[in-house]
Amino acid sequence: MKRHLNTSYRLVWNHITGTLVVASELARSRGKGAGVAVALSLAAVTSVPALAADTVVQAGETVSGGTLTNHDNQIVFGTVNGMTISTGLEYGPDNEANTGGQWVQDGGTANKTTVTSGGLQRVNPGGSVSDTVISAGGGQSLQGRAVNTTLNGGEQWMHEGAIATGTVINDKGWQVVKPGTVATDTVVNTGAEGGPDAENGDTGQFVRGDAVRTTINKNGRQIVRTEGTANTTVVYAGGDQTVYGHALDTTLNGGYQYVHNGGTASDTVVNSDGWQIVKNGGVAGNTTVNQKGRLQVDAGGTATNVTLKQGGALVTSTAATVTGINRLGAFS
């Protein structure tokens, strides 16, 4: 069973013990729109630094190379390059027994990090990371900035205030874009291996915040939940976009877009072999269907201001609402 990283962490100063301690913010949000329960607890047993293996990289200091294992903690206020992280998730996500991993603090930077199975990189507000590679079973809890993260089966959880640019999602990796976060220039190569509109919500890109300029390739899937917005998305053959929230300026170059009940899609362009499906309760506005593209509007669906070009196809139920123009003029 796939493990789901859904915990953000920060360090706070404990005036009683005179040490930094770990605070975890548990935000349980399994796919398909489950509710969120937030709890805050101090794990005093994880005082930092408490073990000889725990290290602090001070501001202005640069450290290169090394491996974190066996619940080691690395607290980064300076710069760390080329670290391998293999600890932090041994007991699974949302488990207070987890004590290890890398903590990139305000002003800290971590570059070219490798996160293996059981490893966790935490990027707190004001921290930044680049060129991180995360394997299956590893994760990144992001409250700061991340550039060019590669998820090779790993997970990236974006908490409020986080910005992720250039994430590539491969091999059942998972990026969760929570409310108050922005993911830009993401490339999605996984999530739709089960076929078009298959029921899975824990691989690919899961959007409850803002996703901008996403590219969805073969086998890729973007799920836009009710509170989410996807802007300027390109979907290629074998990939799909599932919309329960808002999708703006999507281009279907052979890919599929499913607009579900409560979802809205505006200014979609359907090119050759692309397919926009507007389901019961879904709404599409200003769709352009080019040659060999296809628009399907199911019973109870709505598509307005459709532009149907020569060679494009429109398939609709008599119980759907459809208006637009084609080469013969207006239709409704």
Which positions does each model-derived feature cover?
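Long, low-complexity, polar and repeat-rich extracellular regions
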Residues: 1-332
